[in-house]
């Protein structure tokens, strides 16, 4: 399949702006989904990365693709490769997101790059999100999305390298179908690999329902804040291999003075997602 990069590149600079109130009810649903206990009082600080649950596109079903994502060619470029994954991203935090604030997300297509991977052709699309709360800048995010070809025989994604030694701090997570369904609902994410097991296996070639990358990033960012005693000023993460529903995984953290390495992994490897949190001195 040929990628017409010159045509796809015409999407660079395209923008989209959406907004939504950060309600106490949303924080309550966030707590119920991830097992956290953040305050739901108006004016209190909302959990880290809850902005991923806010101001998401809400399109009618007839404007969605087979995979459950918005049909390409609107805000996102019409990349002809069938499978989409959240590859990673970087975030800079300028200020808090208070509960009750009106949150605006201004999104811009920044880069579109074609690469050749071990499993075939890839197309990376970078979207920059500027998040503000009641008009005050709060988060700048670079989101990296990768489009891939059809699954190859024998599995779509080979295992990555074995995980490093266990982190200084370790948390166990047992992802259930309910947890995945609830996080999809929180983020209004229609991607069927998270709740439609036959589709995930038979069409996209996964071993089962896939644990959301953004959910892993959220858990790691909050773990970093809890261990350090305050939220980071920067956070970056990269997906390496998938995690699956009903297969427990670990969240690992090893801190230093001004940063913290984090990763998720299956009990016997491989690493699923790597992250690093930063704090200004």
Where are these regions (language model features)?
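Hydrophobic, proline/glycine-rich low-complexity stretches
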Residues: 1-102
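A contiguous, surface-exposed recognition patch within enzymatic or periplasmic domains that forms
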Residues: 2-45, 160-216, 223-226
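HotDog/MaoC-like acyl-thioester-processing domains
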Residues: 2-15, 86-175, 242-246, 250-281
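Residue-level preference for alpha-helix termini and adjacent loops
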Residues: 10, 17, 21, 51-54, ...
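Short, surface-exposed helix-loop/turn micro-motifs enriched in polar/charged residues
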Residues: 44, 121, 231-232
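Catalytic-pocket segment enriched in acidic/His residues
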Residues: 200-258, 264-276
